[in-house]
Amino acid sequence: HGIHGIRKDKKGRIYLIGGNDAKFSGHEDLKQYRGIEGGGIIRYTSELKEPILICHGFRNPYDFDFNSEGQIYTYDSDCEREFVLPWYSPTRLYRVEDRAHHGWRLPGYKRGWKRPDYYFDSVKPLVNVGRGSPTGVMVYKHTAFPEYYHDAVFYCDWTFGKVFMTPTSTNSIGAEFPSSEVFLESMGTNGFAPTDIEL
């Protein structure tokens, strides 16, 4: 639940994602931000200076990626101990919104407290996936696959051994998104626990 993925954008700026025990709240680099809850994303210059809090309110996202427009996508974890309880919050795919709270409020891993998706001041997930352990995230920026997959988000579940895919639009602000599709999974007794995905 600490610091996880690191990526660069097209301008060479460095982004860092961390879970709800990454201790972003109260960190010397982020002392100008008050009320940080859960995990978040920080952006630095290419020289690792001038940190900016992009967003917060995550439980434990491992990875993230940018689409062709520079929008960030991440896959956040659930609190598996609360599965089937009324307040359970499933794993979920987000299109990250700048300076926004994405719902998760507590540190630690033993219990959860996520704002409901209908709260006006929380970002609603693009897709609520269900039980799982989110790991790698990649936006497909290539031409080998059919156009249907261009700019689609691929994201991995370690627990159930699946790679999900959610197609997006090149004009993704306000676009409609379908449910997750299983792109890849193991069969029979073959083990498959994806931890990362790259292109």
Placement of each model-derived feature along the sequence:
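Beta-propeller domains with acidic blade repeats across secreted/periplasmic ectodomains
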Residues: 1-199
